[in-house]
Design a protein with these regions (language model features):
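RNase H catalytic domain
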Residues: 5, 9-15, 52-124, 129, ...
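RNase H-like nuclease fold core
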Residues: 1-45, 56-63
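Extended, charge-rich low-complexity interaction segments
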Residues: 133-140
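Short, conserved alpha-helix that lines the donor NDP-sugar binding/gating region
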Residues: 47, 51
Length: 140
């Protein structure tokens, strides 16, 4: 079984956005991936973009995948528990459905940000943002 942990974030929401992804099997990380995705995106758009890329990367390794995210909105939309009302999110939702066709089985799971693998994906996206000059704001 292959597991993906994906995370997307935007500084400013909306603002500059990036994604971070890990692909793992048998407790070992096979792939670490991060990418800057735009200068004006929302957190929800970034979460969907991260999942789409995670599915693309996982399809190179398996036909059965469990996708783990910390976005309750995205997971519940994919499970049909929430409607997709935002036109941009609907476009991304449909892209996810298209990517799912590459698999025999796709499962979705929402976890806390404190999940150790989710934290790695989060670190990857934050490193990507910082590499492009978008520093975290520190509140004092």
């Amino acid at each position: 079984m292959i597991y993906t942990n994906s995370d997307g974030g935007a500084r400013g929401n909306p603002g500059p956005g990036a994604i971070g992804i890990i692909i793992r099997k048998d407790g070992k990380i096979l792939v670490k991936y991060s990418l800057m995705i735009g200068s004006y995106v929302t957190n929800n758009i970034a979460e969907y973009e991260a999942l789409i890329k995670a599915l693309q990367l996982a399809s190179e390794h398996t036909k059965e995948v469990t996708c783990i995210l910390d976005s309750e909105l995205v997971v519940k939309q994919l499970l049909g528990e929430y409607k997709v009302r935002n036109p941009r999110l609907l476009e991304l939702f449909l892209k996810v459905q298209k990517e799912q066709e590459k698999f025999d089985v796709v499962r979705y799971k929402c976890v806390s940000r404190e999940n150790k693998f989710q934290q790695i994906a989060d670190e990857l996206l934050n490193e990507e943002l910082e590499k492009h000059g978008f520093k975290k704001k520190v509140f004092r």
